[in-house]
């Protein structure tokens, strides 16, 4: 077992920030090969993206870290700690904590795509964290690349000199060695603060079935030794450091980690929620006085009900969610029941991508078939008595008579697109109650549009719509800015006078009629005909605002009456009518699963 007491001057902690698909994980693979951490014949594409789902979607979901040893041109051996960060807006808190563990960042921009919205958002996070930023243009070998145009965008954005921009092709391995040399020259070494009390920043944690939660941390001050008693600031819990070490492709145990090192800590933590991202670890016997700044509890922004297709799979769903939440501390869930769907869970997610990933992992890794209800945001309802209720499920909304006002969360959105699509995007924004703020021109063809939106309007399918109105050229990023008053109403769906709780939604009053009408039409096309007439109504409180009727299937009871008396026929028709009436009183309309999914894709009409 080696001791990791390296000289701080030879350590470089850096991360790669980029928009989705700009080649971040591929560049990380080239680093691993260039530093002989990974032999070419071992390589699987995107080594750091170890979830199947991460490779398939081409995104990084969890933060990862790896240590490489590199001998530079001057003959000195350096330790490079690469902290790979998620690039998606849903995981921006994880990104900010990963950045806090570094001294430098590579800002990777695709030579064919240029600067995108998340590139800018992550750049701002890196600037806030005070990092040395190295601009890198990737994919320079592609025929469609525009290196000079993209360089100009970076110069306008960051104010750097053209000579500071590095050019690479991660796929072909061009320029990788020059980039490694630039990291050593330009990224500062950590400050040597080994004599201070221990403070270490947690930037990720994963769950291992045998070892418990494995905590990834960056030592900021002091030293951590194997066998030390450590304390977590967020919950004051004390654990024994059973094993500490650094992270190559596999974990490498060491006896000591000092300030500037990035490593892992195993201390028999049963629940990953005890090791929160952004928390500070210190020694229980000689604690630091205050935690590192920047920690916050991550709150879910989007809520949705998950129900098993088969009600007898409820326990399987519970177990699957428990296992998933061991590895994902930002997933929140509570049991709930619905008259239409039975037993299920109300789950809170960081955003839409997070929600999709959880659903896909449930179905793929745990083979649980689920129905998802319409995603909602958390509304604040101020009652006429002055109390405040938080509502994340339309069925929990109090009666209109008790409501003084309703507030909903707003987000600040930046959309980067080509100038020719401004009109389309403005139109889409107005449809979604967006409030235009201002426009920045990035260059002669690309613009950055700033809006403020209610979160509920973009949580649904806004991203898909944005891509279609801009022919795929727009990218977006959003940031939460707080609650505002809104004129919102609860829209109920009634089938033969009975409310179906799973189809209720909260909508803006100006959109209620249109939404109700389209929902009724959609349900009419999906719910099968019954032996009796079915009335589908959309209502706000007791006021019905839209209605569709599914006509009854009827048997021709007069088929066997050849000629004969009219009163005989009338008697048979009356008898049929009575039967239908009775059937309608006792019959319940079976709602097919597609009806719940119909609400999710209302715009496909």
From Swiss-Prot:
Annotated residues for binding of GTP: 21-26, 138-141
Organism field: Chlorobium phaeobacteroides (strain BS1)
Alphabetized SUPFAM superfamilies for the sequence: EF-G C-terminal domain-like (SSF54980), P-loop containing nucleoside triphosphate hydrolases (SSF52540), Translation proteins (SSF50447)
Full protein name: Elongation factor 4
Cellular-component GO terms for this entry: plasma membrane
Membrane topology (UniProt): Peripheral membrane protein
GO molecular function: GTP binding; GTPase activity; ribosome binding; translation elongation factor activity
Top-rank EC class of the record's enzyme: hydrolase
Chief place of localization: membrane
One Gene Ontology term from the biological process aspect of the record: positive regulation of translation
Gene3D superfamilies (alphabetical): 3.30.70.240, Elongation factor 4, C-terminal domain, Elongation Factor G (Translational Gtpase), domain 3, P-loop containing nucleotide triphosphate hydrolases, Translation factors
EC number: 3.6.5.n1
Protein function: Required for accurate and efficient protein synthesis under certain stress conditions. May act as a fidelity factor of the translation reaction, by catalyzing a one-codon backward translocation of tRNAs on improperly translocated ribosomes. Back-translocation proceeds from a post-translocation (POST) complex to a pre-translocation (PRE) complex, thus giving elongation factor G a second chance to translocate the tRNAs correctly. Binds to ribosomes in a GTP-dependent manner.
Gene name in the database record: lepA
InterPro entries attached to this UniProt entry: EF-4 (IPR006297), EFG_III/V (IPR035647), EFG_V-like (IPR000640), EFTu-like_2 (IPR004161), LepA_C_sf (IPR038363), LepA_CTD (IPR013842), LepA_IV (IPR035654), P-loop_NTPase (IPR027417)
Family of this protein: Belongs to the TRAFAC class translation factor GTPase superfamily. Classic translation factor GTPase family. LepA subfamily.
Pfam families associated with the record: EFG_C, GTP_EFTU, GTP_EFTU_D2, LepA_C
Catalytic activity: GTP + H2O = GDP + phosphate + H(+)
UniProt keyword terms in alphabetical order: Cell inner membrane, Cell membrane, GTP-binding, Hydrolase, Membrane, Nucleotide-binding, Protein biosynthesis
Domain tr-type G residue range list: 9-191
Subcellular localization(s) per the UniProt record: Cell inner membrane
